[in-house]
Amino acid sequence: MIGMLTGRVAALGADELVLDVSGVGYLVGAGARTLSRLEPDQDIVLHIETHVREDAFKLYGFLDDIDRAWFVHLQNIQGVGAKAAFAILDTVPVSEIANAAALGDKSTFARAKGVGPKLATRIATELKDKAPPTGRSFSIGLPVHSDDGTTGGAPVAPAGGDSLAREDAVSALVNLGYNESQARQAVAKILRDADSEAPLGDVIRLSLKELAA
């Protein structure tokens, strides 16, 4: 299986790109949000999700591994394929997806193109009590991709920092005796309304206040 590709953008399409890796062109499917951050001849690192079927071998690429993790997580739900998963990720930031999942907020998922009311309800219902994905942690420094398409050389932190902080807060509340589902909903409400950079201690304190209300 292929987990990561490093190369140069040789061509961009409506829903895919060709990545030149040492002279070999890999055709990689990608969402609109990822493609909008790329330019021809740009050197990039793509986190890859590989789908293998009897009649197809498909690569899907992401600039951030937490997006790849959510792409996989969403497709565990009946009726959600690659197209619907990309539509959700293109419409809703992963931090907002995590909040919507914890709160069972179907309206967030219904914003995605091609996701109707029934599917949005199923997604919200099935994700509500599931732990969100955190992505893979890499021991090497990867380029930092900014939204304007530029690439820096600084190492990045392990993927899914927001998800890891969320899990730490939920774990702390569970250790204090709260039900995991209640803890997830409380943390989601705080992260939705508060500064996403709020210290973990503040998130736990505000979540406790929410649970006591």
UniProtKB/Swiss-Prot annotation:
Organism of derivation: Maricaulis maris (strain MCS10)
Protein's name in the database: Holliday junction branch migration complex subunit RuvA
Subunit text: Homotetramer. Forms an RuvA(8)-RuvB(12)-Holliday junction (HJ) complex. HJ DNA is sandwiched between 2 RuvA tetramers; dsDNA enters through RuvA and exits via RuvB. An RuvB hexamer assembles on each DNA strand where it exits the tetramer. Each RuvB hexamer is contacted by two RuvA subunits (via domain III) on 2 adjacent RuvB subunits; this complex drives branch migration. In the full resolvosome a probable DNA-RuvA(4)-RuvB(12)-RuvC(2) complex forms which resolves the HJ.
Residues covered by region (Domain I): 1-63
Span list, region Domain II: 64-142
Region annotation Domain III: where it falls in the sequence: 161-213
Predominant location: cytoplasm
Region called Flexible linker, residue ranges: 143-160
Domains: entry comment: Has three domains with a flexible linker between the domains II and III and assumes an 'L' shape. Domain III is highly mobile and contacts RuvB.
GO CC terms: cytoplasm; Holliday junction helicase complex; Holliday junction resolvase complex
SUPFAM superfamilies (alphabetical): DNA helicase RuvA subunit, C-terminal domain, Nucleic acid-binding proteins, RuvA domain 2-like
UniProt key word DNA-binding: yes
UniProt cross-references to Pfam families, sorted A to Z: HHH_5, RuvA_C, RuvA_N
Biological function: The RuvA-RuvB-RuvC complex processes Holliday junction (HJ) DNA during genetic recombination and DNA repair, while the RuvA-RuvB complex plays an important role in the rescue of blocked DNA replication forks via replication fork reversal (RFR). RuvA specifically binds to HJ cruciform DNA, conferring on it an open structure. The RuvB hexamer acts as an ATP-dependent pump, pulling dsDNA into and through the RuvAB complex. HJ branch migration allows RuvC to scan DNA until it finds its consensus sequence, where it cleaves and resolves the cruciform DNA.
Protein encoded by which gene: ruvA
Record GO terms (molecular function): ATP binding; four-way junction DNA binding; four-way junction helicase activity
Record bears the keyword DNA repair: yes
Family: Belongs to the RuvA family.
Localisation: Cytoplasm
GO BP terms in the entry: DNA recombination; DNA repair
Keywords assigned: Cytoplasm, DNA damage, DNA recombination, DNA repair, DNA-binding
Taxonomy, superkingdom: Bacteria
Signal peptide: none
